[in-house]
Structures are given as C-alpha cells and as structure tokens.
Amino acid sequence: LREAFEAAVHRQLMTDVPYGVLLSGGLDSSLVAAVAARYARHRIEDGDKTEAWWPRLHSFAIGLKGSPDLAAAQVAADYLGTVHHGFEYTFEEGLDALPEVIRHIETYDVTSIRASTPMFLLARRIKAMGVKMVLSGEGSDEIFGGYLYFHKAPNAREFHEELVRKLDGLNNYDCLRANKSMMAWGVEPRVPFLDREFMDVAMAFDAKYKMVDKASGGAQRMEKGILRAAFDGYLPDEILWRQKEQFSDGVGY
C-alpha cells in the first residue's frame, strides 16, 4: 500500500510549472505532502536526473484566526521541512466571496459552499504566488471509509458497497467542487489517492481490514487504520492519528 501510494504521488508530480501541496494538517494532505517532499528536489520529467526549479516543496493552508487546520498544518510543515504558507481570512472575506463561489461551483448546496469558500480564497492566494498546480488529499475517505458514519457498517460487504457508492459519486461532489473552486483562479488540483493504479491496489484489500474495531487496540481502533499503519514513521503521531474533521470545520467555521 505504501509503495503504491509513493508511486502515485511520483506520477502526479509530472509537471513543468511551479507546484505545491494543500496541507490542512490532517492525515490525507499530510501524507501527500510527506511523499511529495521526498521527490521535490528533482525533476520527475527527466527521471529525477536534474534538480527541480523549486528544490523545496511549498505547502499551503487557510483558516480563520486560531483554526485547528492552521495549527496542525504548521506542525506538519515544520516536521516535513516544507516552505509553508498559512493564510488567515475573515468572516467578512468569506461572505464577500459567496456570490463568486456560487457562480463558479454552480450549486446552492450548503455543504459544497462551506467547503468551497475557503478553497476558493486559498486558490486566489496560491495563484498570486505564481503556483499553477497543487496536490490534494481528496479521495482517501472514500477509499478507506474515513467518514465517521462508516463506524456503523454492519459487515464488510456493506462497508465495501458504500465505499463503491461514494467513489462513484465523487465526480459529482467533492472532486467537482474542488476542481471548480480551484480552477476559478487557474490552479489545477491533482489527487494522488485517486490515481488509477493506486486505487487498484487499495480497493483490492478485504474491506474487513478497513473497518473500525475499537476493541482491537491496534491500528483498526480508528478510521483509516490500515492507511495510518502503512505510513507509520512518516509523520508525528499527533498528525498520523489525528481525528477526521471536515475541511469547513477544520478551517474554523
């Protein structure tokens, strides 16, 4: 699983423009950043033979003042050694952006708007820095059952069926929202967790190993335990075992 994800991130780094990673300090974005940081010194395009234009990975986070994501992202960035850019925004900025956000994401769905607003504001700042592509942690929750309601799955078969249902709908919800809110400013988001070859590996695992078993005392005591265990040592425990938060909650509203 680890090797497949490392290869997926490596493939997604194929680019001839300045790039970075979205880093909320949660498990998914931190894993993407951790792997990308290992490859950032060299150009993927020529088989890692020459140094990259930006030999240090740049990471980006946004939130209201004092938000959990800003604090957690800084911890992860310090550990990984990225050039980190943590941006704060105000309620007023969020409210002012709503008409543009709704126009770009083309929906009045409240959940989509909540998640898109900080991403839209972050994309504007990223584009102003000349960055044109970012890696994101989207897709992990759908592959590994990261949403808290997966705790209630009665058995492995129904757990897996719900994973498939969530993945089938990604193009209409999370991925569509992320693409529209970022591309509004010409920033391309890429999602290594949804790399086809990685998904072939991840979805081949028996769903029982993805389910939460709080009584086990092992990795499965928390959602996405199989993923956390695979990357043991990549991140500090406070990040590797951080509880899942919605993006809109993590940025502080």
Model-predicted regions and their roles:
Residues 1-235, 249-252:
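ATP-dependent adenylate-handling active sites, centered on carboxylate activation for C-N bond formation
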